[in-house]
Amino acid sequence: MTQYSINEDAIAESSGGEFEREPVPQSKLKSWKCFIGMYAGEHAAGTEFMIGPLFLTAGVSAFDLIVGLLIGNLLAVLSWRFLTAEIAVKNRLTLYFQLEKICGKKLVTGYNLANGILFCFLAGAMITVSATAVGIPFDMPMPKLTDTMPNGATWIIIVVLIGAVISIIAARGYETVSKAADWMSPFIVLAFLACGIVALSQLGVTSFSDFWNIWGEGSDPFPGQIKFTFWHVVIWSWFANGAMHVGMSDLSVFRFAKRARVGWVTAAGMYVGHYMAWIAAALLYAVYLKSPEAQAFLSLGEAPPVAPGPMAHNAIGVFGIIAVVLAGWTTANPTIYRAGLAFQAILPKLSTAKVTILAGSLATIAGLFPAFAMKLLDFVALYGFILAPFGAVIVFEHFFHKKAGIIKNYAESAKLSFNKSVFWAWAISFGLFYFISVQFDVFLSFVTFPAWILCGVLFLVFSKLFQKQVQ
């Protein structure tokens, strides 16, 4: 055994095999095959059963949906490949440890707390999705689009049991999360495809024009929803995972990649999940909207419920129930794993398994409240807007620190616990564009990229100014 191998084994043992506070060693790097299942599984998953129908409630047209998703998902793949994966293989650090080097311990603690909690809310929405399938044999009342609170004891019991299983899987670490996705994702992808085909038959589609006319020129949004245009679809689908790519959260995943080109595997998630699966789920909801139950809601001026379990069950029976359960798991598993890493940075004395169980418990509590799933379009937009600008700090420092003449990883080198350059860059960009969104009723996803750019530029400017003062 070489000294290099001995050192790698020592690192792995001290880190519990997750390498939270050191670069991933060469012997632990993984090929593209280890990532494609995770991304296909995570993005052809529980969120898709919610997002597809929610596009219909927003009154999208056929062109807006089909072409808008094509472009928006391409922008997401390019962001992962040329930003996230590129930086990840250079540094091989988690997002949280990388930010600590730049921001300082105190500042990054606040970020990690917000990041972990938001991840838990997202995972909770996926537990909600799985619960709508598990509850079918028990004749459980399904949550409505406007529901916020648990609707009964059966709902609570099912959510708690699902949350416990998901948390245990996530707590076993990246290897288990990746393997779970590898096993589940082919089944889920096949289920989405089958649901789409069956729904087309139920809708009487026999030609492309029939398919196009399902959405046609669009419609008025359902009560309580906003109208989605072409640009809403493009920008929202680009930043649906903004915290993961331009926000750099997936540094924690791609640090295990052998090469940056592994970032291209995210296309499996975007075009199998955020394209085929969203459209298939929208077709399931289109079938439901023709039912007497849905028509009764619409006649009363109310939005029909979006319950993935019954919709999939109506299309492909028990196979649909199983698919929805597994789809929720494959999104919640890696999301809880990421949340655990965020909490690990705040509570470094706790093992990865313990903080992941903590994250899973919070996600389970969130899953009890259907609002996180029913308002998923709005929540995902807010989530990306809050977290993405922090990724700009990493990106702009990585690519422009030499041109800007600033010191890389300044908090680490200057032994700062609070880098005010980062704080003011984020606070100004967040405050300015959130004000614009609220004051002028601008869709939040529209201002995410401008806020990201401004945060990166301000970080370079403030770093140049403050570092010069210190020197």
What would you call each of these model-derived segments?
Residues 57-59, 86, 102, 110, ...:
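Membrane-water interface regions at transmembrane-helix termini and the short interhelical loops
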Residues 39, 140-172, 186-195, 231-250, ...:
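Transmembrane alpha-helical segments of multi-pass small-molecule transport proteins
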Residues 1-64, 221-235, 254-262, 465-471:
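Membrane-interface "cap" regions at the ends of multi-pass membrane proteins
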Residues 157, 161-202, 208-212, 267-270, ...:
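Membrane-interface loop-to-helix entry segments
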Residues 392-465, 469-471:
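C-terminal membrane-solvent junction of multi-pass transporters and transport-like membrane proteins
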Residues 108-146, 325-345:
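Hydrophobic transmembrane alpha-helices that form the core helical bundles
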Residues 131-135, 187-220, 235, 242, ...:
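Hydrophobic alpha-helical segments and their helix-loop junctions in multi-pass secondary transporters
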Residues 2, 69-103, 112-127, 288, ...:
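Juxtamembrane transmembrane-helix boundary signature
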